Amino acid sequence: MKIIEFRKKIPYLRYLEMQEKLRKFRKECILFLEHAPTITGGINYNPENLLVKPEFLESMGIQIHWTQRGGDFTAHEPGQLVLYSHVDLKKRNLSIRFYLENLLRSVIDSVRSTWDLQLISDSDSPGLYLESNPSQKICSIGVNFKSFFTSHGIAFNLSNDLKTFRCINPCGRNWTNMTSVKDLGLDFGLHKRDELISCLKKNLCSFLEPINVSSS
């Protein structure tokens, strides 16, 4: 399995093309990247949770795409760390539940190691929330399990300004419930981003055993 860090922002459509090729050839790969301002709707999206018209999004330079991942609407923007994980569950004999639990556990442990920040999950609303304020969401999750090969993944709010979230009710909740490392007054510098990625690699390796780390 390869782990690739993209230093430049990746267009969302380019990612959709990449994940289809990875699934077609069942090539395992973990990607770390950022997107330009983008709104995506999952297979369970509620039209009422899109608060503005597509024409307004276009005028603001915000893309909108419909995807096959689970969940409702979410947003991507610069400063948000996106982790896309492509894993062959069939080959590894892993259950969907095991994969999701360990993906979230990897993020929880990595964030705690990086900032001493405690996160919790919510079985009624996927994602990760502040233990000190469970209404505040800092990490979104949406995964596709087609053919028992995963795609999409998690989006962690690091230094993004959260403005794109104002156009939606993310996962059906008010956008004001979203927070970020920056909003919490914690160090969000590049060295912290790199530290978080390093921790994520280590924790993901503990249950996926990836190899061949590279950068792009």
Curated annotation (Swiss-Prot):
Protein name (Swiss-Prot/TrEMBL): Octanoyltransferase
PANTHER family documented for this protein: LIPOYLTRANSFERASE 2, MITOCHONDRIAL-RELATED, OCTANOYLTRANSFERASE
Function: Catalyzes the transfer of endogenously produced octanoic acid from octanoyl-acyl-carrier-protein onto the lipoyl domains of lipoate-dependent enzymes. Lipoyl-ACP can also act as a substrate although octanoyl-ACP is likely to be the physiological substrate.
Active-site residue list: C171
Alphabetical keyword list: Acyltransferase, Cytoplasm, Transferase
Binding site for substrate: R69, G70, G71, D72, F73, T74, A75, H76, S140, I141, G142, G153, I154, A155
Extra information: In the reaction, the free carboxyl group of octanoic acid is attached via an amide linkage to the epsilon-amino group of a specific lysine residue of lipoyl domains of lipoate-dependent enzymes.
Cellular compartment(s): Cytoplasm
GO biological process: protein modification process
Pathway recorded for this protein: Protein modification; protein lipoylation via endogenous pathway; protein N(6)-(lipoyl)lysine from octanoyl-[acyl-carrier-protein]: step 1/2
Family: Belongs to the LipB family.
Pfam families on file: LplA-B_cat (PF21948)
UniProt domain BPL/LPL catalytic: residue ranges: 24-212
Disulfide bond residue pairs: none
Catalytically driven reaction(s): octanoyl-[ACP] + L-lysyl-[protein] = N(6)-octanoyl-L-lysyl-[protein] + holo-[ACP] + H(+)
GO cellular component, one term: cytoplasm
Main location group: cytoplasm
Molecular function in Gene Ontology: lipoyl(octanoyl) transferase activity
Listed EC numbers: 2.3.1.181
Major enzyme class: transferase
UniProt-listed NCBIfam families: lipB
Residue(s) at site: Lowers pKa of active site Cys: K137
Transmembrane annotation, as ranges: none
